[in-house]
């Protein structure tokens, strides 16, 4: 008999779990193939908001993909208790966009996302969810 169960989370519960912000992973098609990078994020104004450096590998890959259309990415956030063998994960899928206008950047700064990575990280990006899914593993 299994001692764990997996529960599918609805969108509201998934968004509640990620609303505090933290560290998530952006998955996208880079010029070298599929890539997954951890970034500090905040949930703000109905979107995942994060920062990166101009001309970084992430910026260059996304600039190429974003130009002229929606560049679809996945963003994954999770929290686990390895000793208790339980936790949850949420995946957001949708287009990534640079936050271009000064007004929009000022609003995004209000989200308070602070990258751990050193250096100038003044390029703001957002992912607007088209699909939100989540799962929780817990004791049976």
Positions of PLM-derived features:
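Extreme N-terminal tail/first-helix region
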Residues: 1-19
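Charged, gly/pro-rich active-site loop segments
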Residues: 2-3, 73-140
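Short connector loops at helix/strand junctions that flank enzyme active sites
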Residues: 19-21, 36, 43-45, 67-72, ...
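Short beta-strand segments
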Residues: 21-54
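Short acidic/glycine-rich loop or secondary-structure boundary segments that cap or lie
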Residues: 36, 49-51, 58-60, 84-85, ...
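Compact nucleic-acid interaction/catalytic patches
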Residues: 44-65, 73
């Amino acid at each position: 008999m299994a001692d764990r169960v997996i529960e599918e989370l609805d969108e509201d519960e998934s968004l509640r779990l990620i609303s505090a912000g933290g560290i998530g992973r952006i998955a996208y098609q880079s010029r070298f193939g599929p890539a997954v990078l951890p970034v500090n994020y905040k949930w703000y104004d109905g979107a995942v908001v994060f920062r990166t450096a101009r001309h970084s590998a992430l910026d260059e890959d996304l600039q190429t993909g974003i130009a002229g259309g929606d560049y679809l990415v996945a963003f994954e956030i999770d929290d686990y208790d390895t000793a208790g063998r339980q936790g949850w994960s949420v995946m957001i899928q949708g287009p990534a966009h640079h936050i271009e206008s000064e007004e929009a950047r000022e609003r995004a700064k209000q989200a308070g996302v602070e990258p751990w990575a050193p250096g100038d990280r003044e390029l703001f990006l957002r992912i607007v969810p088209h699909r939100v899914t989540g799962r929780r593993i817990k004791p049976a």
